[in-house]
Amino acid sequence: MIQNEVSATHGSTKKGITYNTILEAAQRPTPLVPLKKLKVEHQLQSDIYVKLEYLNIAGSLEDRTADKAFQFAEEIGVVRGDEVFVTAGGSAAISYATVAAVKGIKLTIYAPKGEFDLVDTVLHTLGVKTVELPFGTFAEARVQTDEAAQQKGVFSLNKFTTNAAFVANLQKTALEIEKAVNNKSIGKVGAVVIPLNTGAAAAGIAAYYKGIGEHGVRVVGVTCKKDTIPEMGLDLKNDLLQEYNVEKREVEEDEAYSFTRHLIGTEGIMAGPSSGAAVLEAIKLAKELPAGSTIVVVLMDGIRNYLRHFLDDDWITANKKDVVTRKDGPQPNSIYDPKVLVYDPTKLAGEWTQDPETKSWSHSEVEFNKFNPERPLVLDTVLDAIGKTPLVKLQHIPKAHGVKCNVYVKCEYMNAGGSTKDRIAKRMVEIAEKTGKPGKLVPGVTLIEPTSGNTGIGLSLASAVRGYKCIITMPKKMSKEKSIAMASLGSTIIRTPNEAGFDSPHSHIGVALRLKSEIQDAVVLDQYCNPGNPLAHYEETAEEIIYDMGDKHIDLVVLTAGTGGTVTGISRKIHERIPTAKVVGVDPHGSILAGPAETDIDFYEVEGIGYDFLPGTLDTSAIDYWAKSHDKESFLMARELIRSEGILCGGSSGCAVHYALEECKSLNLPAEANVVVLLPDGIRNYITKFLDDDWMNERHFLDA
């Protein structure tokens, strides 16, 4: 049950929310975002809003169906530990696997040939068994699944899946849309457009409008002419579509791929191809409807499953798709003035000052934002989907590791761009737009940023929305998934040698400085020195933690450290508001953030944490003490979080949780103690890394 608490301990009278499982966080409505740029580009007289279903807990609209299907199964006696079979592929398979992980169900998923190709690594990590059948249709696969379940004497979820999709979207998706109408956040809906997978979701939405007497609302389902786009048209229930008057429209595969890439780069909507196809048809529909109409597009899923698919230029070329590939961006000149490399990343811009009485902080150059805990149903842009991430209590892992206290994790991978770095990217851009520091931002200007990846994704997202060009310099060890995610948002990516120190002209910092000197009016926001980095976490992240914990006293906060902005900003706010709480920073062996200043280890695999210098954004005095981390334990814990709790987190998240549990045991924290751990990002960027058994085995991380 969701816990609603009144925060007495921390001085607030408002209610905060924590969730007992990640599945409870699925009850949060997904936001609506208007497509402003595309409206102008296509000279539309109607408004199109997209519903960001990829911000669900497992990344798709199918999460709603999977949750409801298991609820139906539990009502007839399925319990934790039972074995269940289901037929599903693609994003739906991940949704069922995630719900099964949370509920402790032993799940076997059957699917036609090829339906696991984009998701098999994630499914394996979630602990489900997959059976690929030599059939071409889901109808045939369902028959085989049901027969196999009957022979083994286990439950087949197939009897509920269609009804679950219908009911979940009738009771939740459609209702969330109508709440936005009732709140006058959007105009009366004239049409809802949705990708057709089975069609049951579209039928459920149509049934909702029919049930409330809104017979004028058109529900339009979109499918692919040749059934070649993932998540589209492979398992249609045409009888349902006819019964509830769902219109069908078709798109060409290559047209959908091209448009979806354009949608991502123009609006920052990180959607999968079926979602892009639906938006494309919504634009065509908008030209048919009366001026002033409102169209809502329900997005099926996001980019996670497609980073080695239609978003990858290599895949486009290999599969001979009629899609324009990206052009190479600028490279720094080989001859440069050494003076451009004069730079000190250890000095923070401006000064922080603490009031000796209130203990609150201020900054000499930046006006602070007031914290607002509300999560609107309708956002101005996708950048407003950054923040307000859920705080979830771990149910199984602490006990399995001998920890008595309560451990809550803040799921930052549910930010719009997929990580906690979205926050600092947004804040640094806001500050530059308002103050002109560290450079003036106007549409068309070039942002350049050296980063390990996640800040680059956040800045690429902000640049797409705000109309800036973006160049990201990044070490080669960072995943290809990160590079493709940034490129899909319109950024140019330049890779640099892993071994190059920060002061080398060939490092990601050195290359960024050289490019800045060569590109007119280019701006380096500089996450290592920019006050917006710690400020984003002081103003927002820490406030969210305190607000959501309510009257549950916080004893310990555990944070991984990279640029230092996260640990500095959160620690300052926590110490200001809860003086008795302790904050622990986690730093990998091979990094010098927590010391020693010199180390024999010069390489570590966990991405996004640690550095070979002390950034200006890091205030080491704000941290009570440090823990040094190892790769193996970090990755194994991340996998355990995925499999045992259904929390689809990245390697640095595993790092934070592993060392949080070690600290809980070291301190012998009692059952009533509360620990908060921040999970920086999710699995999207690491599917070919720590989620892959071969990658883990090559590094001996799976050795006993």
UniProtKB/Swiss-Prot annotation:
Null allele phenotype: RNAi-mediated knockdown causes developmental delay. Larvae have shorter body length. Larvae exhibit homocysteine and cystathionine levels about 10x and 1.6x higher than normal, respectively. Knockdown at day 1 of adulthood decreases longevity at 15 or 10 degrees Celsius, but not at 25 degrees Celsius. Decreases production of hydrogen sulfide (H2S) at 15 degrees Celsius.
EC identifiers of the protein: 4.2.1.22
Stored Pfam families: PALP
Predominant location: cytoplasm
Xref: SUPFAM superfamilies: Tryptophan synthase beta subunit-like PLP-dependent enzymes
Subcellular location: Cytoplasm
Cofactors named for this entry: pyridoxal 5'-phosphate
Biochemical pathway: Amino-acid biosynthesis; L-cysteine biosynthesis; L-cysteine from L-homocysteine and L-serine: step 1/2
Up-regulation conditions: Expression in the intestine up-regulated by prostaglandin E2 (PGE2). Expression in the intestine and body muscle up-regulated at 15 degrees Celsius.
Transmembrane segments: none
Annotated InterPro entries: Cys_Synth/Cystath_Beta-Synth, TrpB-like_PALP, TrpB-like_PALP_sf
UniProt binding sites for pyridoxal 5'-phosphate: 454, 562-566, 652
Catalytic activity reported: L-homocysteine + L-serine = L,L-cystathionine + H2O
Protein family: Belongs to the cysteine synthase/cystathionine beta-synthase family.
Function per UniProt: Hydro-lyase catalyzing the first step of the transsulfuration pathway, where the hydroxyl group of L-serine is displaced by L-homocysteine in a beta-replacement reaction to form L-cystathionine, the precursor of L-cysteine. Plays a role in maintaining homocysteine homeostasis. Involved in cold-induced somatic longevity mediated by prostaglandin E2 (PGE2) signals from adult germ cells, perhaps acting via a role in the production of hydrogen sulfide (H2S). Required for normal development.
Record's protein name: Cystathionine beta-synthase cbs-1
Species whose genome carries this gene: Caenorhabditis elegans
Lineage, uppermost ranks: Eukaryota, Metazoa, Ecdysozoa, Nematoda, Chromadorea
